[in-house]
């Protein structure tokens, strides 16, 4: 049996309002639990449209047919009008999710984090994280114990900024296996659970067709030599491609794959995890930099 961590990122108002309820129903039907990471502040995702002047981002949008994939309400959110507060508008849905699934913070403002966190000070990072955690805890009525950086925009500064919040784990980068981030010689931070597998929007296009994606990603899960972690998005697999996602759950189970919340991947003694660090890097299919796992030594 292959155990795969299932991470669900919720970036937008529509993803929360429409995608999450469908995903909850899908997961219930298939007897699967996952980790949901919510954006709880303003939905300003439409402000990413200026990135269309960048060739790699434009190609990604064309390759994934973004207008039909996400919908124009997502692509234009927060452009001509102030972005609506996601958490306030969908508190009931978020609370219901937290009743049945592991629930953590994705971001206060997904667009702001993805655009500006790379040059924020440690203090600015801490303030933004605190704002998101405070809002999410007020909604779910219990402590937030995990987080996942929006767009995998994370480096050593982000690791340090999250330390005061005493989280059980973070999922801030791409990599191969769980690790303890090295803060300084002799001091390690909160365990990291990297995403190891590509997302739909990173690979769909000429190389992998939509109708063959499930076969392709299941093969990648079974071949993963580390600790497999797969990310879906409420805006994609919860709306337009919900039937394909449910088919993936069925076919994965038949292939001997069991999905689980990321927290279940943690060992009893996190001290046994290898050391590592998060550095800025690039991966195929994703525009811009993101956090990538790198080995580190204790010396």
Swiss-Prot record:
Pathway membership, UniProt: Glycolipid biosynthesis; 4-amino-4-deoxy-alpha-L-arabinose undecaprenyl phosphate biosynthesis; 4-amino-4-deoxy-alpha-L-arabinose undecaprenyl phosphate from UDP-4-deoxy-4-formamido-beta-L-arabinose and undecaprenyl phosphate: step 2/2; Bacterial outer membrane biogenesis; lipopolysaccharide biosynthesis
Enzyme Commission numbers on file: 3.5.1.n3
Domain NodB homology as annotated: residue spans: 2-260
A GO cellular component annotation in the UniProt record: membrane
GO BP terms: 4-amino-4-deoxy-alpha-L-arabinopyranosyl undecaprenyl phosphate biosynthetic process; lipid A biosynthetic process; lipopolysaccharide biosynthetic process; response to antibiotic
SUPFAM superfamilies membership: Glycoside hydrolase/deacetylase
Molecular-function GO terms, alphabetical: hydrolase activity, acting on carbon-nitrogen (but not peptide) bonds, in linear amides
Catalytic activities: 4-deoxy-4-formamido-alpha-L-arabinopyranosyl di-trans,octa-cis-undecaprenyl phosphate + H2O = 4-amino-4-deoxy-alpha-L-arabinopyranosyl di-trans,octa-cis-undecaprenyl phosphate + formate
Keyword Transcription regulation: no
Keywords: Antibiotic resistance, Hydrolase, Lipid A biosynthesis, Lipid biosynthesis, Lipid metabolism, Lipopolysaccharide biosynthesis
Domain of life, source organism: Bacteria
Family per record: Belongs to the polysaccharide deacetylase family. ArnD deformylase subfamily.
HAMAP family reported in the protein's UniProt record: ArnD
Known role: Catalyzes the deformylation of 4-deoxy-4-formamido-L-arabinose-phosphoundecaprenol to 4-amino-4-deoxy-L-arabinose-phosphoundecaprenol. The modified arabinose is attached to lipid A and is required for resistance to polymyxin and cationic antimicrobial peptides.
PANTHER family associated with the record: 4-DEOXY-4-FORMAMIDO-L-ARABINOSE-PHOSPHOUNDECAPRENOL DEFORMYLASE ARND-RELATED, GLYCOSYL TRANSFERASE-RELATED
Alphabetized NCBIfam families for the sequence: PRK15394.1
Protein name: Probable 4-deoxy-4-formamido-L-arabinose-phosphoundecaprenol deformylase ArnD
Annotated source species: Salmonella gallinarum (strain 287/91 / NCTC 13346)
